[in-house]
From Swiss-Prot:
Part of the 50S ribosomal subunit. Probably part of the RNase P complex. GO terms for cellular component: cytoplasm; ribonucleoprotein complex; ribosome. One of its GO terms (biological process) is ribosome biogenesis. The keyword Disulfide bond does not apply. One of its GO terms (molecular function) is structural constituent of ribosome. Disulfide bonds: none annotated. It is found in: Cytoplasm. This is Large ribosomal subunit protein eL8. Belongs to the eukaryotic ribosomal protein eL8 family. It comes from Staphylothermus marinus (strain ATCC 43588 / DSM 3639 / JCM 9404 / F1). PROSITE patterns: RIBOSOMAL_L7AE. Keywords: Cytoplasm, Ribonucleoprotein, Ribosomal protein, RNA-binding, rRNA-binding, tRNA processing. Its main location: cytoplasm.
Amino acid sequence: MSKPFYVKFEVPPELAEKVYEAVKKARETGGKIKKGTNETTKAVERGIAKLVIIAEDVDPPEIVAHLPLLCDEKKIPYVYVPSKKRLGEAAGIEVAAASAAIIDPGGAKDLVEEIIKQVQELRAKAGA
């Protein structure tokens, strides 16, 4: 199945797992996250997001299509995960989350830094 048009680079499954773990760990260890596209968009516009996570299975895709462009404009790293349902679970909500943002990584600081480094390498390879 082809990726939606807003997915600018391929994220390996191992990295996606680390992302779910980082969201959950940040939430559970005194960090701060934003859940959902409205909150995520505001966090990016305010320049307070450390890492933005965008689900690949969002329908319609236009809901999150603006996020990669906005993140690039604000120089905020972003990463894709395959499942909005798992992203919602990692964020601690009962419903799916099309996107989320880590504002303060809390105890997931090292994990978030590692993810950002891997994302930069993936984007460089993909020319994204």
